[in-house]
Regions:
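Basic/polar, cationic surfaces and motifs that engage anionic cell-wall
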Residues: 2-105, 152, 166, 175-253
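Short, surface-exposed glycine/acidic/tryptophan-bearing loops
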Residues: 155-169
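Short, flexible loop/turn elements at secondary-structure junctions
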Residues: 109-111, 139, 143-145, 174-176, ...
Length: 253
C-alpha cells in the first residue's frame, strides 16, 4: 500500500488486478510550516516552560488534521514567519511580536456534548454547524493533566464571539456545568496543576498577559454559560493565585 499524505490519497491493489484509491483527511505534516507554533523550549522559556515541556503534547500527538482554510473560515495569522529558517529565528521574531498582541487568556470547558478529546473538538469545529477552519482553542487541558497543542498560537483564536484578538484560548476537556440531569466532571488536581504551569509558561514568554477570564466573563460573551459556575469558581481562584485581573477589571468584560 502506498500513501500520499500531501494530497490525501491512499492506493492499494484490490487483489483483482485493479488499483483502488481512497481519499482520506489529510494528516498534518508541513501544512503549518508558515505559521508560528508555541515552543516550550524557546529562548524565553524559563522554569515553567521547561517543566511544561515534560508533559506537553503537540498536534501531531493527537493526529490533528490540517486546517480547512477557505473563504468564510477564519484563520488569521498575527505574523508571517516565511523566510525564517531556524526555530530560534522564528522564536525571536514571533515572541517579540506576539507579546505586543497578547493581553489575555480565556478559559473554556468542552461541556456535555461528548467532545472530550482534542480530536473530537477539531472534527466538530471543522465539520459541525460553525464551519471553522480548525480547532478554535490554542490549548487543551485534560483531567489527567496533559496539555495539548491546539490552533497554532500565531493564529487568532475562534473561541470567543467577536472578541478573539489578543486572547489565548484554553479549553478544559471536561464538563464543569453541574446539572442534575447529566454526568458532570470534577476538577482534578492534575488538571489544575497543569493549567497553572501552562499559564505561568505563557506569562514567561508573553509577559504582557495580565487578564484571565472564563468564556462568559468576556465582552460580547456574557450570555454564555461556559465554563459553568463550578468552572468559574476555579478561574476566580486561579486569578488570585496568578495575580491576574478579570476582564471586567481591565475593561474587557
Amino acid at each position: 500500500m502506498s500513501e500520499n499524505k500531501r494530497i490525501g490519497i491512499a492506493s492499494f491493489d484490490s487483489g483483482r488486478g485493479n488499483t483502488m484509491k481512497i481519499i482520506f483527511p489529510k494528516v498534518e505534516e508541513d501544512c503549518l510550516s508558515k505559521y508560528y507554533r508555541f515552543n516550550p523550549k524557546s529562548y524565553k522559556g524559563s522554569k515553567y516552560s521547561k517543566y511544561l515541556n515534560k508533559f506537553y503534547k503537540d498536534r501531531e500527538s493527537w493526529n490533528a488534521i490540517c486546517p480547512k482554510i477557505e473563504e468564510g473560515r477564519s484563520f488569521e495569522s498575527y505574523l508571517k514567519i516565511d523566510g525564517l529558517n531556524t526555530q530560534e529565528e522564528k522564536d525571536v521574531f514571533a515572541i517579540n511580536k506576539l507579546n505586543n498582541d497578547f493581553f489575555g487568556i480565556a478559559i473554556h470547558h468542552s461541556g456535555n456534548g461528548g467532545l472530550n478529546t482534542m480530536k473530537k473538538i477539531q472534527n466538530d469545529h471543522i465539520n459541525g454547524d460553525n464551519q471553522r477552519a480548525d480547532i478554535s482553542y490554542h490549548f487543551g487541558v485534560s483531567l489527567s493533566g496533559e496539555v495539548l497543542e491546539g490552533r497554532p498560537i500565531g493564529i487568532k483564536g475562534a473561541h470567543l464571539t467577536k472578541y478573539n484578538t489578543g486572547i489565548i484560548g484554553i479549553v478544559f476537556l471536561a464538563d464543569f456545568k453541574h446539572d442534575w440531569w447529566d454526568v458532570d466532571d470534577d476538577m482534578s488536581k492534575e488538571a489544575l496543576q497543569s493549567i497553572i504551569t501552562l499559564i505561568k509558561a505563557l506569562k514567561e514568554q508573553f509577559p504582557n498577559i495580565g487578564t484571565l477570564g472564563g468564556h462568559k466573563e468576556w465582552k460580547n460573551n456574557t450570555d454564555r454559560t461556559c465554563p459553568g459556575e463550578y468552572g468559574l469558581d476555579y478561574i476566580k481562584a486561579l486569578r488570585k493565585e496568578l495575580k491576574l485581573k478579570s476582564p471586567k477589571e481591565t475593561g474587557n468584560g
